[in-house]
Design a protein with these regions (language model features):
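N-terminal Rossmann-like FAD-binding beta1-loop-alpha1 element of flavoenzymes
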Residues: 15-42
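Glycine-rich FAD pyrophosphate-binding loop
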Residues: 34-58
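Central helical "cap/lid" subdomain
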Residues: 50, 60, 153-204, 264-266
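N-terminal FAD cofactor-binding segment of flavoenzymes
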Residues: 55-96
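Short beta-strand to alpha-helix junction loop
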Residues: 69-75, 98, 104-126, 245-250
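A conserved short coil-to-beta-strand element within the FAD-binding core of flavoproteins
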Residues: 135-147
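Active-site substrate-recognition segment that forms the wall
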Residues: 192-244, 253, 257, 261-262
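Flavin (FAD/FMN) cofactor-binding core of flavoprotein oxidoreductases
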Residues: 252, 259-295
Length: 328
């Protein structure tokens, strides 16, 4: 929906529920509200849907810049994933990664990791369906009386990292302000490295322990299923913290660290670095899957549990159901 049409709509009547953030938590929340017949509008400051399930095209192909994969153990989320799989949007990737550490390299088995041939963002886009998502809309303020940039709402959902939500909230909204202030987040950089050829041994993905630069490296060609000679590296929080002002300056160090780790003789043909100031929640306290207070402010995301795609989806889904029950 174009911004002008959105503005005409919300000035003609109350906006219903305004969801700020079109990542998987915000979209899952809005989906539940729409299903229950509750009027809902989604505002997203970026040009695309997806949030930290971010994919961007480099050299003609998508690469995942945020979440590296997702796992499934919730039956309801499994049903969503089954629909993605049936539509050709999601695929089982691997249940075995490797880990590099002081003792060398070893295989690590675990749950099945899922990937998306067209990028993880495509999954959020499918979930959004026909939801009224307005992109390129930067929300500036959420005030008492439930006013979003001066427009009344029946409830407001902030589906984003706590430090970003704090910038929008009027301090008079005390419960939500306290909730977002309690969140702690860690940064990361992701580097997309396109090499001349696949010179590395088969590893799919690698946890890197005790390294000054790297925390995870994924074979994006294997993950995507096209065999492209592309690696995506994720840095440690400590390394990222020193490069948040100029993330592109970290590109040589990230590339060299990957080449040293995997013994790659040739430099990358191209390299791109993306900054995540709030990459993942550092800690979670409590058992609640979302926040919803008497002021009508809801918070959702992977801060309400382990930092996983499934956590964010369930948080948004649960909040959407709670709001539908309150407003229905």
């Amino acid at each position: 929906m174009p911004p002008a049409a959105y503005d005409q709509l919300v000035t003609a009547e109350r906006a219903g529920v305004v969801v700020v953030g079109a990542g998987i938590a915000g979209v899952a929340c809005a989906t539940e509200l729409a299903r229950a017949g509750v009027p809902v509008r989604v505002r997203e400051r970026a040009r695309v849907t997806g949030g930290r399930m971010a994919s961007k095209r480099f050299d003609g192909r998508p690469a995942d810049l945020g979440a590296a994969y997702f796992t499934v153990d919730d039956p309801d989320f499994a049903a969503v994933v089954a629909r993605w799989q049936a539509a050709g949007l999601a695929r089982e990737w691997t249940d075995t990664l490797v880990a590099y550490g002081p003792g060398g390299r070893e295989q690590v088995s675990g749950p099945m990791r899922w990937a998306a041939p067209r990028g993880l963002r495509s999954l959020v886009e499918q979930l959004a369906g026909d939801l009224p998502v307005t992109h390129d809309r930067l929300v500036m303020s959420v005030e008492p009386g439930l006013r979003v940039d001066g427009t009344e709402a029946d409830a407001v959902v902030l589906a984003m990292p706590g430090p970003q939500a704090a910038l929008l909230l009027d301090p008079a909204l005390a419960e939500a302000t306290r909730a977002v202030a309690a969140q702690r987040w860690s940064p990361a950089l992701s580097g997309v490295l396109h090499f001349p050829a696949r010179r590395w041994t088969d590893f799919r993905g690698a946890f890197v322990n005790g390294h000054p630069v790297l925390s995870l490296v994924c074979d994006d060609g294997d993950r995507r299923g096209d065999g492209a000679p592309v690696l995506v590296a994720h840095t440690t929080a400590e390394f990222a913290a020193g490069h948040l002002l100029q993330p592109t300056a970290a590109r040589p160090a990230i590339e060299q660290a990957v080449r040293d780790l995997l013994g790659l003789p040739e430099p990358a043909v191209s390299a791109h670095v993306h900054r995540w100031t709030y990459a993942s929640p550092a800690a979670h306290a409590g058992s609640a899957t979302f926040h919803l207070d008497d002021d009508g402010i809801g918070l959702a995301g992977d801060a309400f549990g382990r930092p996983r795609v499934q956590t964010a989806w369930r948080s948004g889904r649960d909040l959407g159901r709670a709001l539908a029950a309150r407003l229905g």
